[in-house]
């Protein structure tokens, strides 16, 4: 039997065709029992059947296999569960005959509190605490609910039957076929599913209300939520029904199931899960309260619903063959969710906001410790770690880059062909490339392999010499060290206006292009500067390519002027800023030049551009403080000046008929001013917060600016005056809206007093905060609170490991607490602490976090060497 241990995949001698699964969850004892009968095709000589199982007790006496066309069931004399490998090995006394037989097993397990497998979530109903039973099987946890072939390529049909209390709602992937009441229990059986992977099977049992609608072709769509919250499901319902219609057209394949249920689960580890026909969500990703949710909450609901519904085609109908190709699922669903959201809400300018996805991808992929989009996965424990910004955000960004290169129409037609060819089966990355190649006639596989099979991305350096534009590519690393790698880079450039545009591929390390031939631009003889109508050259127009651009001084100056005069699109203004920030962090350009560029954004009012500038300002202020404490107040003062214009235009109160984007921007700008200690902002925020304490429905504190007010209150809290902090905790305890709770949690640790930060972190681990939400409390730890947070992490590590250690959330604890540091000593301390405590599922995150500390430390050293920085900051502030 030992020959089956230590293997990444199950042996191929038996293939499941159909599961008949019966489950009986006990929501009071938090246990479940079950039986499964599996139609199993024996395709090779074997005495063994090997399948996945974990955290289950299998009743040995219940195990039997009935060969094809036989009525005699064979018992399995040996039944062994290898816990570490999560496999169940059944050994029979004889070689099993080929063909489809039936394997039967009985088992029982515990409804765990780890938010994976078959688990329990708690909620209150009429003041009483109750349990619901929920499944979360992706990536490899169906095996914790029933023994199965728990790999995405082992697709089968599922016939599910549940035995549950009569007063509860019981949902699964398919519609109910019949219900039989038996005393205070009911037996609910569901229609048999189409062929699908185990990770998409879903069951939810609890008390729920729902709202209902239909798609244009009559498919029933419902949103389920806790009793009394049905109204909060209406927005998601509208988006869901419209999105299913939209994808039916886009993919040229109808939605394959008879119904779509979307349900809000109070305890949920991820944002949402695309189970076929029964999508589960965190409450914050599905529910929208007209009065107390912010515009950003509304947008989050729309994009998450669109993402999960895209998976019904891309992931569920066509499934990746193995987790190496996870990015096909996630990168694609991320990209196409923007397409759907843009179609439903064009005024949100969501494709400009897509840049935030690209930036997150570029940020992670700039690390030595990144990984390729297509990544080897050899153990179930490694899968969790690749649900990261590479699979989702870099994945989505390279799809956007390819669509931009091939054209939208060709891209769409090729995708429809791909889905048609692989429906109800599995695909690898090469299959997608083959479909796009057939549809476009372009060498897509050759073009894209450099982007998916090697990690990292290039920085393209641009300079003008003797009338030629010289481009050179090299791998970009945030550490500033030279990297290996070469890409086929789709270059787009404009000169002086968007009318003059050129696209070409940079296939070698470098190239020189005659500007007159390329764009009709004239360059003064012997000059290396552009002039006349060509006052600027922008490379990577619309940021369509997944790479960075480094301009020489004269090109950079031209772009800075074009930014200030708003001659560039918001997407290009964003790109110039983001590249400049990344190059500064990598010490390829000075902090002085980054700050000079930032001053060109003083009149900026675009939401996406300004919110990125705000994110950059937080980082620069903290790193400046690490380099030189005196510098910190100067840089804060400078950024307050940069944000004043937008703050003045937007004010505190929503204006009649203002845009969704202005509503989101107001909150971000006011939060930044509060964080930087702007006196007027702090006073006004506290005044409005006091009005809110007196009346939760006051118009003085609409949801879009609440976070700003909460952060302002925490800036003033300290150990001798905790009143503001205590008031916020009171609001937290009184609200039952998850979005309000997470908004408060995300503000508490921004307090500059380390004693309060310590209190906040202990509160985060209390029973008052759901395990899924603890990370919000860590997200905004102040510069002054870093050390306290690190000590706390070490002291509480055993508890944190026991509570979150089996899922991906534990990696977020490490990155949130470790990454903000900026000293080599701290990196060493972290390494020493984790030397005996790391596990395979957190190894990559730990290395990435330590690498970020090294990057910060090197950056601090280089800032210390910059001359006249304090004078420059003062000068920029006074302009």
Swiss-Prot record:
Motif annotated as Dileucine internalization motif, chain positions: 728-729
Gene symbol of the encoding locus: APM1
Positions of region (Required for membrane association): 98-205
InterPro entries xref list: Aminopeptidase_N-like_N (IPR045357), Aminopeptidase_N-like_N_sf (IPR042097), ERAP1-like_C_dom (IPR024571), M1_APN-typ (IPR034016), Peptidase_M1 (IPR001930), Peptidase_M1_aminopeptidases (IPR050344), Peptidase_M1_dom (IPR014782), Peptidase_M4/M1_CTD_sf (IPR027268)
UniProt effect for mutating residue 273 to K: Abolishes function
Stretch forming the signal peptide: none
Superkingdom in the source lineage: Eukaryota
Positions bearing the site annotation: Transition state stabilizer: 392
A GO-annotated cellular component: cytosol
Subunit structure: Homodimer. Interacts with N-1-naphthylphthalamic acid (NPA).
Lineage of the species this protein comes from: Eukaryota, Viridiplantae, Streptophyta, Embryophyta, Tracheophyta
PROSITE patterns the UniProt entry points to: ZINC_PROTEASE
Catalysed reaction equations from the record: Release of an N-terminal amino acid, Xaa-|-Yaa- from a peptide, amide or arylamide. Xaa is preferably Ala, but may be most amino acids including Pro (slow action). When a terminal hydrophobic residue is followed by a prolyl residue, the two may be released as an intact Xaa-Pro dipeptide
Protein name: Aminopeptidase M1
Keyword NAD: no
Organism of derivation: Arabidopsis thaliana (Mouse-ear cress)
Family: Belongs to the peptidase M1 family.
Result of knocking out the encoding gene: Loss-of-function mutants show irregular, uncoordinated cell divisions throughout embryogenesis, affecting the shape and number of cotyledons and the hypophysis, and is seedling lethal at 5 days after germination due to root growth arrest. Quiescent center and cell cycle markers show no signals in apm1-1 knockdown mutants, and the ground tissue specifiers SHORTROOT and SCARECROW are misexpressed or mislocalized. apm1 mutants have multiple, fused cotyledons and hypocotyls with enlarged epidermal cells with cell adhesion defects. apm1 alleles show defects in gravitropism and auxin transport.
Names of required cofactors: Zn(2+)
Entry keywords, A to Z: Aminopeptidase, Cytoplasm, Endoplasmic reticulum, Hydrolase, Membrane, Metal-binding, Metalloprotease, Microsome, Protease, Zinc
